[in-house]
Design a protein with these regions (language model features):
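Short, glycine/charge-rich flexible loops or terminal/linker lids adjacent to PRPP-binding catalytic cores
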Residues: 313-359, 369, 396-399
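Flexible loop/turn segments at secondary-structure boundaries
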Residues: 91-92, 122, 186, 194-195, ...
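Amphipathic alpha-helical
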Residues: 145-158, 298, 310-328
Length: 400
């Protein structure tokens, strides 16, 4: 975020539809663990089920990590055959309980469960327009604007997917979107393909996920990515695709490859680990330096450091011990929290860097919080020289 190309993106969506009417909450719960790196401020799960002729929805959400919000007792309260899960990093809207996703909207046509990853550039104008028509907002997030737009359009068209399409014609910005109604699940991606969204299948259960690693966690097979501008509708009758919103121009978020995504996932057919490895090799070609060892800043800098080492012939080393109980510093909501997190997250291995000329590879500089403190950490551990190399070129003016 900040000066990189994910300004205002709320972190991740995951949705599951079980054609056999099974319970989905546990699958969503485990899948969210695989997406925890994308957002650590809050999370939630909403499910829906049929009781006789009546459709009931349930939702549990709260501030904190997945394992802090949910336990066995809470999961037992969630019974449904369709559900939506979400983990959040706040960008548009404050980090408060009211802004936790997913959103459940009850209206004259029934119930919608909505989760959104992205940021709208015209959200303020759309919110004002909806308020003038009588809408009352309970959050400050873009996702509620999208949910209200879909619900309002649904009053005038025959299907939820048609309502999603009409809403997409009005919203501008970056979004990967999941909408679940009682008997169908819809995944949509903005025409530029800014953020990822993929489809998975396990037996008769279907999934949408921001990253394919969540599919692996629940034993689902990766089917394909949702294409930029595509609306995918899943019902008991099968899968339907509408690509009429597709654009000739794609503008994928480069920061997904640089930082956000897990290295074991693929985005639009490109392996994240391989892209980072290649970036490190190019960095060694363009910015060589004579040194004794190449080290990466865990975790997203490691692959680029390996690539730099492979290309330069300088040995690769592990210079840091990481505290696995500390989250990603970049997605902490406050500067003070980011600075404190750096100090407890990493510690330098004196045995590795003492008396050596060190090339330190990091994936990017967003706020500079991590890099400055880690350079001091390596120097304090006895390094003679510290040469910082950044595997991402600067991106200054992304509005999304």
């Amino acid at each position: 975020e900040m000066s990189a190309s994910l300004v205002g993106s709320e972190m991740c969506i995951r949705d599951r539809y079980d054609m056999d009417g099974g319970d989905v909450a546990s699958s969503i719960y485990y899948g969210l663990f695989s997406l925890q790196h994308r957002g650590q401020e809050s999370c939630g799960i909403a499910v829906s089920r049929t009781d006789g002729e009546k459709r009931n929805s349930q939702m549990i959400k709260g501030m904190g990590l997945v394992n802090e919000v949910f336990d066995a007792e809470k999961l037992e309260q969630l019974h449904g055959d369709i559900g939506v899960g979400h983990v959040r990093y706040s960008t548009a809207g404050a980090s408060i309980p009211e802004n936790t996703q997913p959103l459940v909207l009850n209206y004259i046509k029934g119930t919608l469960m909505v989760a959104h990853n992205g940021n709208l550039v015209n959200a303020v104008d759309l919110r004002r327009e909806l308020e003038l028509m009588g809408a009352i907002f309970h959050t400050s997030i873009d996702s509620e604007v999208i949910a209200y737009l879909i619900a309002r359009e649904r009053l005038h068209v025959g299907t939820v997917e048609d309502a999603v399409k009409l809403a997409m014609q009005k919203i501008r910005g970056a979004y990967s979107l999941v909408v679940a109604s009682p008997r169908k699940m819809i995944g949509a991606r903005d025409p530029f393909g800014f953020h990822p969204l993929c489809i998975g299948k396990r037996d008769n259960a279907y999934f949408f996920s921001s990253e394919s690693c969540a599919l692996d966690t629940v034993g689902a097979e990766f089917v394909r990515d949702v294409a930029p501008g595509e609306i995918v509708t899943i019902t008991p009758q099968g899968i339907q695709s509408d690509r009429s919103m597709a654009s000739d121009k794609c503008a994928r978020c480069i920061f997904e490859y640089i930082y956000f995504a897990r290295p074991d996932r693929y985005i639009d057919g490109i392996c994240v680990h391989s892209s980072r490895l290649t970036a490190g090799k190019i960095l060694a070609q363009e910015h060589p330096v004579d040194a004794d060892i190449v080290v990466g800043v865990p975790e997203s800098g490691n692959a680029a450091a390996m690539g730099y080492s492979m290309e330069s012939g300088i040995p690769y080393g592990t210079a840091f011990v990481k505290n696995s109980y500390v989250g990603r510093t970049f997605i902490k909501p406050k500067q003070s929290a980011r600075e404190s997190s750096v100090m407890v997250k990493l510690n330098a291995l004196r045995e590795v860097v003492n008396g050596k000329r060190v090339i330190m590879i990091d994936d990017s500089i967003v706020r500079g919080t991590t890099s400055a403190r880690i350079v001091k950490m390596i120097r304090d551990a006895g390094a003679k020289e510290v040469h910082v190399r950044i595997s991402s070129p600067p991106f200054m003016y992304c509005l999304l």
